[in-house]
Amino acid sequence: MKTYGFVRGTMIAMACVAGFAATASLASPFGGAIQPRDLRCEYRVDPLGIDVVEPRLSWTLQSGQRGQVQTAYRILVAGDPKQLAGETGDLWDSGKVASDQSIQVPYAGAPLTSGMACYWKVQVWDKNGKPSAWSRPACWTMGFVGRDSWKAQWIGFDASRNRDPSGRKLDLSGAQWIWLPGENARNAAPVATRYFRREFTVPEDRDLASAVCAVAADNGFTMFLNGQQVCTGGSFKEAVTADLAKHVRKGANVVAIEAQNVGDGANPAGVLAMLVVRFKTGKPETIVTDGQWRSSDIAAAGWTDAGFNAEGWRNAEALGAEGIGPWGKVTVGPAELFLPPAQFLRKEFNVEKPVQRATVYASALGNYELHLNGRQVGDAYFAPGWTDYDVRVYYNTFDVTNQLKKGFNTLGGILADGWYSGHIGWGRLRDHYGKDTRFSAQLTIEYTDGSSETILTDKTWTAATGPILEGDFLMGETYDARKEMPGWSTPDFDDAAWKPVDVTDKLAIAIESYPSVLVRKFQEIKPLSVTPTKDGACIYDMGTNFAGFVRLKVQGAEPGRKIVLRFAERLNPDGTIYTTNLRGARAVDTYLCRGDGKEVWQPRFTFHGFQYVEVTGYPGTPGLDAITGIELTSDTPVVGRFACSDAMTNTLYHNVCQTQRANFIEVPTDCPQRDERLGWMGDAQIYVRTATFNTDVSAFFTKWMVDVEDAQLENGGFSDVSPRKVANGGGTAAWGDAGVICPWTIYTVYGDTRILARHYDAMQKWIDYCKGTTKGTLLRPAEGYGDWLSIKADTPKDVLATAYFAHSTRLVAQTAAVLGKVDDARTYHQLFEQIRDAFNKAYVSADGRVKGDTQTVYVLALAFDLLPKEKRPMAAQHLVDNIRDRDWHLSTGFVGTKDLMATLNAIGRTDVAYHLFHNETFPSWGFSIQHGATSIWERWDGWTPEKGFQDPGMNSFAHYSFGAVCEWMFRTIGGIDTQLAPTEAGGPAYKHIVIRPQMGG
């Protein structure tokens, strides 16, 4: 039996640092006195430029005396730090307020206006009525109060973004699905790898203009041209496109495709491809998959090369044209990527008087990096953040008082595509919100004489392109150091060759202060090893799977030397990097050397999900110090840590945290590596409670819930992803329910009633939408994603959808009660009871068996309180029996896994939960760890010894949904809970904390 020794001090510190509890019991330098600390405004420390006119103030408490509590507080807010030091609150003096409230205290002082600086501190009284010392002072500043306050114009350099007219789109006309003959490929081909090749000739007298391809496969493929790998993919719905021009040669050529059919058993398989070679004159050469291709089930040496002896290979079987079943229509993105350079924008201005305070407010349609007098402003990445730019855009606020100087100054911005016009999601699609990026900034200078001046983006700015040739989240960044412009954001720089900017006067959308935490560097990661490859490259193992990029160091390179960095989460059996699961994401960074000694470079406008880095083109033999990993994540403060005596459990916790950081980049995404990286709603609601144990995600989810409501459909259905991706679906059970579950979770953890009030109407619309889909039965239809990626356990979609309909309805009833909407609370509670009755009549038999008889149906029925009291023990036994019949293994997918372990606890079978937790055989958390996982896999069988890699169309190795078990780890192993019993609520925001570890194993 394994035992767990939780680090108790760390456990309690988590609760206190997060500001959840009004009590404190840690030893501290304050002795027996109680002391307020960690002051925050709107969830953040000293936030700049907020636009909340009644901001909420919070603090934590520390005392060396067990059982201490706050009994009263006094808050002072002043417009000047000197006044605050004199204990004068000219903006607000709350007076002594008898209350134990230490979070979400609303400001109730003088009206706040644009640009105002507010300094504040707090004093509290303990259980004996003894006052504390005043806290250290904190501050916040106001941004723009009022929608018409933004005066700056929106500028860009459109000439840098001219589309290449040669970028044609392929339509796969004439191509046919092919496979090895005689394998019944349209229905049930064996799980195996097959090989296909086709030779073609380029006449010696024709000059090449371009060569492009589009390839789709069921399930995955790697394509070669003349022996060189040119692209990989893993989807039959979206074709991967690639530029092949540098690989085509005059004379004999061969295109070769290695295709994999994966799955638990025989299933459809096929390859569909088109290659178009265009010449400077005359007709193009088009090669399509058809019966003339040669095929084999054996890959002999040299099979991808021209001149290979294909004796013994057979003609492929043509299965039918593009559009046939079971594959249907295939989406094809642009044949040639459009990756414009970053734009450099600048403006000189003169400061003639002493400066009191200087503040920059900056925004963009795209991503920007702000510079002033030769230095970057701030340390964040990907500002101003991701929104639905058809609805709103955020601005960020920076204090630049110390960067200004008397005389001439220069304000500059670097502008890249970002989420606005860069590649988002699958299909290599871009320009989701617009084609032309824009930058906007207002610099407000307040002088010591009381006067002020504002520098705005307008037509007087100038623009150019520079060393950043490409900057795209999915495709990577290309940087030519020979094109650097030293001093471009300083007054001494000569910008005579720069061009006038293009100007957009105003935007017809909301411009608001950024309410979340920006993306920043979390840590630097040193590689563990570097291994040379047979083709002259080197592969670095960073030791863990993370999101970010690498900093490159090189010395002694000649000017123009190209160093290429490719990124992957795993290695192939032959030691090469596994990139097939990236699908359409190129994920390549390229550095062209300056050639003047030591050079250091890192990207600005891209990130990747990876553990391995392939480096080619490096001069000489690179050492371990040639690259350093830079891990990025949204700057959600760490509030929880977990450690115990079991190595596997500690590794699992590391993997959970690693995956959370990798996917909490601006929004809660599904994965950081492939051509997706979207704010999938189902994943977010499954994981949000776990996230709160690890980091303070209050501001992060406050912002994202605005994205969720912005993406809500007119019929009340929530989008499957938020922010909205153009032409994406919605209204899906367990995914759309995030619009109810996430704000409720933020309320329960942080005591935030405003998030409930703000999104209450949207929550009601969701319930109305769900009810409308039932057509009077209160049973939702069998549609949606179901229990995504379960293991041979097909949970009926109508059961799952109806269970979630009931659950969300109950949460809306509870929300209404919190908001004081008594009639609404009664109405929704009655609706919940009606849905529960319908659920039982339709899906639950007399012996407590639920339709589908999967682990997930029992988890949902029990966790959501859908069963009558007499049937709960029966259903509980069915759940345990199902687990036993699978040799004590789980079969749940995303949805079922979320509540599986807590449900076992609730029915008194914590022993079974520990059994599942300890498993190291498939499927289990331990299985992936046994096979080298350093993050949470998307699939239980992302890789197995028997089958290798799973379907590359859906095979992320950094996907946090199954990491939701971490909530159970904190509640059960760590024993941190807010309930005295499974059915008894402990109040929001850790008003009452129960420390009760449940041992097992």
Residue ranges and their predicted role:
Residues A239-A242, F344, Y381, G427-R428, ...:
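Active-site-adjacent structural elements in folded domains
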Residues S845-M954:
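Extracellular polysaccharide-recognition and catalytic grooves
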Residues P29-A117, K121-R674, G682-D683, A699-T702, ...:
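Extracellular/oxidizing-compartment recognition motifs
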